[in-house]
Amino acid sequence: MQCSWKAVLLLALASIAIQYTAIRTFTAKSFHTCPGLTETGLAERLCEEGPTFSYNLSRKTHVLILATTRSGSSFVGQLFNQHMDVFYLFEPLYHVQNTLIPRFTQGKSPADRRVMLGASRDLLRSLYDCDLYFLENYIKPPPVNHTTDRVFRRGASRVLCSRPVCDPPGASDLILEEGDCVRKCGLLNLTLAAEACRERSHVAIKTVRVPEVNDLRALVEDPRLNLKVIQLVRDPRGILASRSETFRDTYRLWRLWYGTGRKPYNLDVTQLTTVCEDFSSSVSTGLMRPSWLKGKYMLVRYEDLARNPMKKTEEIYEFLGIPLDSHVARWIQNNTRGDPTLGKHKYGTVRNSAATAEKWRFRLSYDIVAFAQNACQHVLAQLGYKMATSEEELKNPAISLVEERDFRPFL
């Protein structure tokens, strides 16, 4: 009986491997089911086009925003979501993690990581080719006739909330709030979404579920893709403060430390150090400029984007070789000097961007900051984040803790 938990864990991991193998085998076959489509004329049109989605051999630009939770990735995602010629997806890898990784393991084991990364790369490759049917393997319950209401944060994608993918009677073309999209649009038709994807020149995907750029090498080197990686980093002290505020239960011991002034003996330090280790490993690879990343990698500090959003956005689009859309410029103008009361939603993007980047300095005690600086000193120096040497320095907004650095893209 003492080994029963090991047996359960082994069975769970075996089940994951079997699921993933089955998905790989099944998805090698056609997803196309013309008879199941009910829209007038749509089945015939798709049947004439062929039974499968072909690989896109044009030079579509495929953008991946590589980030971690609470690093400003939703904000960066909007810089692409607002572009009229970009098909943007918000965290599609959520479905992979939710389906393949048992909740009780939280995806921390090496075996979980290998399964997750293999499945994630396969899904990303398919999504960049506008094959949204592949996503159905990870949606529970499975879509019926390629329609579902279970796509994670569907409302965060403008295209999925606009005509022709969404066509609610009597509604205007503009749906402002994510919740409005979900309520007014009804079921998501993945066939229509795939058509909308193919009509656009570029595909952008945001993820916080790939630890580092090395994990993407197979996709970067895939000749069928034109993948460019925007790695978004943020001061780990700021990430810790934001997560403690947003995920109050998960980070309750950090909050307890802040409230009592005493460090809990059972504090999960990996909630901080994992971020620093992943940043350091990934950024080290990027800054070494290996040949496989030439023209494919750009490092962006959230703080630089927050201080000068228009300038940094122009640099990002120049690196990608995509013309900057006027809708993007307008969105930046309207959403980076916003009323702070409008940015309280934990995934909101309306904010005073410069103030938001510095807010962590008033949400952490100096003891916690000193601990974080000691644990993450290498990556702080690597990314140009200065140490706060006293409580007074930490709380003084006139003293910048961000060095001037010019992280140029590897061209």
From Swiss-Prot:
Superkingdom, taxonomy of origin: Eukaryota
The gene for this chain is Chst1
Q: What is its main location?
A: Golgi
One Pfam family of this chain: Sulfotransfer_1
As its record notes, the protein acts as a catalyst of: 3'-phosphoadenylyl sulfate + keratan = adenosine 3',5'-bisphosphate + keratan 6'-sulfate
The record's section on InterPro entries has:
Carbohydrate_sulfotransferase, Gal/GlcNAc/GalNAc_ST, P-loop_NTPase, Sulfotransferase_dom
Report what the protein is called: Carbohydrate sulfotransferase 1
Q: Where are the transmembrane segments?
A: 2-23
Report residues carrying sugar chains.
Answer: N56, N145, N189, N334
